[in-house]
């Protein structure tokens, strides 16, 4: 029994390590690098009123129907109506075990379980969810399921949210670090 646990632990460790060894590319999901504000990540409050929350991604603006591509290769974990404020969305598990989220899409052109290559079309830019009254855009966010504990006491973004929001910084990564610079 002890040998089984050692082998299982070793195998899981190798799988986890392999995910970190896969290189990550920097590609725009749509439009141009000048079509997003790289300082909008963790801007607070993003919604009206003090009960708002920090912005957990960057919004890349363009025309409705513009092609949206996967920033990285990976496995599509979710594709469809995300619900609530997010509207139509796609979630891709990419290198380093990071989840790449594409929300407010007009159409979703992939399906869960599919492997996508970098720059493969996954949908079109839109105004779904709570983006109906805003200019068309894709909300691009990056999450790590493995917490970055050292980020707990960091403040990022253009406004400093209350400290009780900082636990989210351990999981939400700045998408601008994954996109080409302007």
Can you say where each PLM-predicted feature lies in the sequence?
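Surface-exposed, glycine-biased beta-strand/turn segments
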Residues: 2-6, 11-88, 95, 118, ...
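Small beta-barrel nucleic-acid-binding modules, principally OB-folds
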Residues: 50-60, 92-96, 104, 142-153
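A broadly tuned, weak detector of single residues within folded domains
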Residues: 67, 112-113
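Residues located in well-ordered beta-strands
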Residues: 75, 101-104
């Amino acid at each position: 029994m002890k040998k089984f646990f050692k082998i299982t632990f070793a195998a899981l460790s190798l799988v986890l390590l392999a995910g970190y060894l896969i290189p990550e590319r920097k590609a725009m999901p749509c439009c141009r690098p000048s079509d997003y504000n790289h300082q909008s990540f963790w801007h607070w409050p993003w919604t009206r009123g003090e009960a708002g929350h920090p912005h957990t991604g960057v919004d890349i603006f363009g025309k409705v129907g513009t092609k949206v591509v996967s920033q990285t290769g990976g496995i599509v974990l979710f594709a469809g109506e995300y619900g609530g404020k997010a509207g139509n969305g796609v979630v891709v598990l990419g290198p380093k075990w990071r989840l790449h989220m594409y929300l407010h899409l007009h159409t979703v052109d992939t399906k869960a379980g599919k492997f996508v290559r970098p720059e493969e079309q996954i949908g079109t830019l839109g105004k779904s969810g709570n983006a109906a009254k805003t200019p068309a855009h894709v909300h691009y966010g990056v999450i790590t399921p493995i917490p970055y504990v050292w980020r707990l006491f960091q403040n990022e973004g253009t406004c400093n949210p209350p400290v009780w929001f900082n636990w989210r910084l351990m999981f939400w990564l700045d998408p601008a670090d994954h996109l080409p610079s302007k």
